[in-house]
């Protein structure tokens, strides 16, 4: 089971919060102190709370739930896309479209449009269109891919969200809250932790800090998925064995 150490957190700069003049008083329980006008996050609490978040994500994956990674700020974009893809999950790393969760049926129509255009370019159907029409479709495809590419395979609402900087992603958090979708988030000293189900206190601006925490959350999804597959395989083998036993008993009785 993946773990996170104090050394890893320190090396990645997870303990550095925002300037003391830019803070949310609700984050006070997670703050160790201040140094040179910067709040220092209590990493002992980060370790403990990360463990709770990890266990939750692991259990969700084990139960077959899907997760949506959300991080549209520049520092988070690469980590969000890479780690979501590594664990076979979905992501939004460009712009959160209002209604992406609360109006998912409409968003799905745009996803289907993107898939259709992709298919046209893949099978050569696009050649039946004029050069101008093909160019317009390519522009539409690029635009849709940028905003919806990370959720192209998401056929239903996710079971949970992992968010980097809930202050920046407040619309996503609000939509998840309305729908009762649990939120796990990296929460810095300037954020409101109230709408977050699993708070991970930490630096949400440094690329190294974001990458470390995001990769560990992806590990939880992978390990939970592996545990699910093992359990399903065990259940299948058990059912096959039981069926074989029944067949064997019938043969003996007939003999």
From Swiss-Prot:
UniProt superkingdom: Bacteria
UniProtKB keywords: Ribonucleoprotein, Ribosomal protein
A biological process term (GO) from this entry: translation
Single GO MF descriptor: structural constituent of ribosome
Position of the signal peptide: none
Gene Ontology cellular-component terms listed: cytosolic small ribosomal subunit
Family indicated by similarity: Belongs to the universal ribosomal protein uS2 family.
Protein's recorded name: Small ribosomal subunit protein uS2
Organism: Geotalea daltonii (strain DSM 22248 / JCM 15807 / FRC-32)
């Amino acid at each position: 089971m993946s773990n996170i150490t104090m050394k890893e957190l320190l090396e990645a700069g997870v303990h550095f919060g925002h300037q003391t003049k830019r803070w949310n008083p609700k984050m006070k329980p997670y703050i160790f102190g201040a140094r040179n006008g910067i709040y220092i996050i209590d990493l002992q609490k980060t370790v403990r709370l990360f463990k709770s978040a990890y266990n939750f994500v692991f259990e969700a994956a084990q139960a077959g739930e899907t997760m949506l990674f959300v991080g549209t700020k520049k520092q988070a974009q690469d980590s969000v896309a890479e780690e979501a893809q590594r664990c076979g999950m979905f992501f939004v790393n460009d712009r959160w479209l209002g209604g992406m969760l609360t109006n998912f049926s409409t968003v799905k129509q745009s996803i289907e449009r993107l898939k259709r255009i992709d298919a046209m370019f893949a099978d050569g159907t696009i050649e039946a269109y004029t050069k101008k029409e093909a160019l317009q479709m390519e522009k539409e495809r690029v635009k849709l891919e940028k905003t919806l590419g990370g959720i192209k395979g998401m056929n239903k609402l996710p079971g949970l969200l992992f968010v980097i900087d809930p202050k920046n992603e407040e619309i996503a958090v609000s939509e998840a809250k309305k729908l009762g979708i649990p939120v796990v988030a990296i929460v810095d000293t300037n954020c409101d932790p109230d709408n977050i189900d699993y708070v991970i206190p930490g630096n949400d601006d440094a690329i190294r800090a974001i990458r470390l925490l995001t990769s560990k959350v992806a590990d939880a999804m992978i390990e939970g998925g592996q545990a699910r597959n093992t359990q399903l395989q065990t259940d299948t083998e058990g059912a096959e064995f039981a069926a074989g036993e029944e067949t064997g008993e019938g043969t003996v009785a007939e003999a």
